């Protein structure tokens, strides 16, 4: 899973990225301090994997991972090359979803490009640039398709209708993700890589002192916008997350306890991203390795097996599955098997989150 972190300059985007990866992107108080897109890979928090590691004491522990791409600060006019322009829009196109960091705090010492915090205005500014960039793509697609139809090939009529539907939506200033498509229309959208069609998780970046507040006016604005478009929202303080990133796991727990917070904002962000993209994890466990594997909800057993190795999918015979809770309750895989809790599933089995699996195959 690859997530692109976007936001206007000085909203706390690089501070957040530093917290995620400790990769050292220079979080200076100056627009465009992020000149190249930084990429960081972080583990997906999963206590189930920790528990399996206690049981199996494996040689290798491999959590699922999320790749974050820190996109340099976008500004009004980016789609026309202002600020750092189109190069960075192209980096977002390669991502599965967008994490849009929105400034939800006032601080005279941290310059805002518009002079003051304005969540709705900031979101609109970014949206306009992404929509304009997508409009340019759709114009080219429509022109190309019309030329093909002039050559007498009427097979492109349906394709053109889908492209024009998207174009009209964008021309009204709406993101492509607000559209709904019939099953046969989706086929024509797959290779477009439209940014405004990607799922969005808004990251409301609040002041440290507001971390325990339930009602924050700036955050309420972000939530209202997200609700209207079916996007997700997480509330974090990037500064607190940065501080947490410098601590040992033990000290992190103590720090969170002192703050009165159950879990780190970054953990919430990763989990919310999974939900937004409809992802789940299945687990494999043994003395050599315990590992989490990321798949889409609705994935069948052979395709899940293919995540491990293409031979597993090609020669799939069956999946031997035990629910994580059943395995833990019985202490070991063999004990669960003796109680009849390990099921033999075939090619049509739809994987569930937390399935602990052994795949049987023959090639």
For each of these PLM feature ranges, what is it?
Residues 32, 46-49, 62-68, 82-96, ...:
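Amphipathic alpha-helical transducer elements in NTP-driven molecular machines
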Residues 40-45, 72-82, 93-156, 169-182, ...:
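Conserved Switch II/interswitch segment of TRAFAC-class P-loop GTPases
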Residues 92, 351-352:
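Short, well-ordered loop/turn sites that connect or cap secondary structure elements
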């Amino acid at each position: 899973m690859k997530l692109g972190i976007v936001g206007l300059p000085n909203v706390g985007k690089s501070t957040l990225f530093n917290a995620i990866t400790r990769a050292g992107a220079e979080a200076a108080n100056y627009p465009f301090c992020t000149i190249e897109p930084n990429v960081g890979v972080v583990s997906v928090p999963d206590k189930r994997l920790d528990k399996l590691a206690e049981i199996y004491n494996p040689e290798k522990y491999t959590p699922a991972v999320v790749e974050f791409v820190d996109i340099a600060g976008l500004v009004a006019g980016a789609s026309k090359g202002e600020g750092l322009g189109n190069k960075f829009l192209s980096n977002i196109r390669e991502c599965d979803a967008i994490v849009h960091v929105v400034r939800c705090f006032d601080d005279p010492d941290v310059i805002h490009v518009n002079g003051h915090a304005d969540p709705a205005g900031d979101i609109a500014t970014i949206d306009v640039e992404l929509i304009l960039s997508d409009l340019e793509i759709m114009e080219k697609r429509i022109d190309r398709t019309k030329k093909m139809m002039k050559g007498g090939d009427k097979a492109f009529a349906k394709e053109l209708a889908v492209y024009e539907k998207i174009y009209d939506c964008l021309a009204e200033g709406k993101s492509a993700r607000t559209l709904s498509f019939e099953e046969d229309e989706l086929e024509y959208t797959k290779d477009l890589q439209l940014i405004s069609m990607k799922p969005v998780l808004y990251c409301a970046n609040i002041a440290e002192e507001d971390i325990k507040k339930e009602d924050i006016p700036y955050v309420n604005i972000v939530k209202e916008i997200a609700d209207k478009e079916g996007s997700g929202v997480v509330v974090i303080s990037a500064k607190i997350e940065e501080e947490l990133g410098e601590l040992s796991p033990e000290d992190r727990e103590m720090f969170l306890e002192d703050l009165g917070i159950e879990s780190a904002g970054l953990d919430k962000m990763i989990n919310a991203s999974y939900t937004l993209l409809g992802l789940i994890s299945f687990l494999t466990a043994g003395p050599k390795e315990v590992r989490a594997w990321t798949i889409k909800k609705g994935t069948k057993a052979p395709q899940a097996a293919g995540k491990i190795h293409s031979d597993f999918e090609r020669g799939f015979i069956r999946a031997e599955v035990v629910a994580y809770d059943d395995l833990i309750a019985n202490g070991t895989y063999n004990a669960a098997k003796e109680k009849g809790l390990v099921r033999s599933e075939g090619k049509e089995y739809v994987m569930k989150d937390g399935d602990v699996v052994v795949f049987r195959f023959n090639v």
